[in-house]
A protein has these predicted regions:
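Small/flexible residues
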Residues: 4-5, 217
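Positively charged n-region of N-terminal signal peptides that target proteins for export
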Residues: 1-4, 95
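Bacterial N-terminal signal peptides
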Residues: 6-13
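Extracellular or lumenal secretory-pathway regions
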Residues: 14-99, 103-221
Length: 221
């Protein structure tokens, strides 16, 4: 009887998650437009090199970076967790779509999730991605520790640190809301060959933009 009740509870929870993805009012990604200028604090990235560990989860390439530094925003501190990639880029800017974006995920001591978005545009070869792409696992079979390789997430970031901020959600089920999103305004570059290589493994793995539903988008100086 207890096992049956547990199975029923799981079914109800799964249905609730599916409903949130479809009916949530603070979902991500969004089309960033009409942002309000605000005296937002600067982003203080304090990332450190870490052993390279990657995973193909069947949906995206994940780079495991737990313990590899933190991001401080005013009095808030968020520990780096991982980086993964979407193509196309998910969030748009005034209707403009980017060919790819990186989501740099963080978590505070209280469990608050925060994602930093780095957009990519086509251009020169990206040296940071050049260290990752040769190690994309061919199939979803857990984490792969790359012997002798270390990586620093700082190498992914653009030089300018202006950003937009909004409250959104996870972009895949269960689509939990309350996630803080930091979208860096300056894109970085990747080559057409690098984009094509990623898309061999994970094509069209971005969620469509979601309604803003009267949320406020803030823009830093």
């Amino acid at each position: 009887m207890r096992r049956l009740l547990f199975a029923c509870a799981l079914t109800i929870a799964s249905a609730a998650h599916a409903d949130l993805c479809a009916t949530g009012r603070q979902q991500s990604p969004i089309d960033i437009a009409g942002a309000r200028k605000s005296a937002l604090p600067p982003l203080a990235f304090a990332y450190t090199p870490a052993p390279l560990k990657v995973a193909n989860d069947g949906h995206t390439l994940r780079v495991r970076l737990a313990g590899a530094g933190e991001l401080r925003i005013g009095r808030e501190t968020y520990r780096l967790q991982q980086v993964h990639f979407h193509t196309p880029g998910g969030d748009k800017v005034a209707g403009q779509e980017f060919p790819m974006a990186a989501h740099v995920l963080h978590k505070s001591a209280s469990g608050q999730l925060l994602a930093v978005v780095v957009f990519f545009r086509l251009g020169a070869e990206n040296a940071w991605l050049g260290r990752l792409w040769p190690h994309i696992p061919a199939r979803a079979d857990g984490d792969h520790a790359i012997a002798g390789e270390r990586i620093d997430a700082s190498g992914l970031l653009p030089a300018a640190r202006g950003y937009w901020r909004y409250t959104g959600s996870e972009t895949s089920p269960p689509c939990r809301e309350g996630v803080q999103w930091i979208v860096l305004r300056q894109p970085v570059e990747l080559s057409a060959a690098q984009l094509a290589e990623y898309r061999k493994h994970f094509a069209d793995n971005a969620r469509a933009v979601q309604p803003l539903n009267n949320r406020t988008i803030l823009e830093s100086p």
